[in-house]
Amino acid sequence: MSEIKLIVGLANPGAEYVQTRHNAGAWYVEELARICGVSLVADSKYFGLTARAVLHGKDVRLLIPTTYMNLSGKAVGALANFFRITPEEILVAHDELDMPPGVAKFKLGGGHGGHNGLKDIIAKLANDKNFYRLRIGIGHPGDKNKVSGYVLGKAPAKEQELINAAVDEAVRSTEILFKEDMVKAMTRLHSFKAE
């Protein structure tokens, strides 16, 4: 497996979106930055907040695009092109409707599952889907017509606690990924379910 050189947390910009479910990917990158002791700084060249971190002696770039969700690929493409980072070296963290709050899973490749952020990233990586994802469960409203309002809404306190617990476990698993490998990181994360 390629080493991960870029970790992206998907989000919508602006104070009104900070606590919305769609921003779960950004919560993960913010927590990673915090444990690495680095600050995410706005960089217009990469259309996002970026930082350079070191995890277990390995360099990694952190990125939260500040474009809207459906333009996330603009930021990912700009940073990946500049640093010559291949899709296989990218991990994209995003909210996942098809998993309950309290669960998170790593995955390599696959489609976008209707997620506009992933859709744009795939397009801007020349339709290469072969990047890693960290899927952070937010649950599903049960009706596809309610999805937009659901992802742009705030989770109730109990659900938010479960999502936060899964994000924390994902951060711990990311440390294992950098210290050991993806198989061990997956084994750890995929056995976790916050109650």
Swiss-Prot record:
UniProt-listed Enzyme Commission number(s): 3.1.1.29
Keyword Cytoplasm in annotation: yes
Residues that, per the record, bind tRNA: Y17, Y68, N70, N116
Compartments reported by the entry: Cytoplasm
Subunit and interaction comment: Monomer.
Similarity section: Belongs to the PTH family.
Name of the molecule in the record: Peptidyl-tRNA hydrolase
Protein species of origin: Shewanella oneidensis (strain ATCC 700550 / JCM 31522 / CIP 106686 / LMG 19005 / NCIMB 14063 / MR-1)
Gene assigned in the entry: pth
